[in-house]
Amino acid sequence: MYTFATICYLCSLNVAFTGHRNYLEVKNEQLRKVVDQFISEGYTTFLCGMAEGFDIAAAEVVLSLKTDYPQLRLLSVIPFEGHDMAMPNAEWAERYRRIVEAADEVVTISQSYNVNIYRLRNDYLVDNADAIICYYSGNVRTGTGYTVRRAMKKCLRMVNLYADSYQIQFFG
């Protein structure tokens, strides 16, 4: 059974975030501009995988824009219950909790940790996205690499903020 919130995001244009944990928050202004561009094109729902680094910074940018764009929705996609306890320090855990509290919907992939849980979370992000905003270095042996490759196979629109200049790309 779908909730009203789930039905709303199934009918909207959705953007998922994926990126490395070593994200440089100095790029937040670029990130904000890209999110603004997607909003101007009618994208209203943003999915965040809730990892430290890029994911959490991206969710915070979306939440900061909700004052100007009340139609925005943030979905926190949590890999498993208690994921916040896996954060590297108290600051990340607190930022994580604030995002979960402010999110319009929280999707929990599993009640407990298992070896495939991050891949399943990444699959959920790609399967429910029309576009991807990423911070991807090109290292294919990472969760971000897996997610980007999967998004490319699905021909999703993609913006990579890793380089100093970025462009919107289409794959297919």
Question: Which residues does each PLM region occupy?
Answer:
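Acidic/glycine-enriched connector segments
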Residues: 4-172
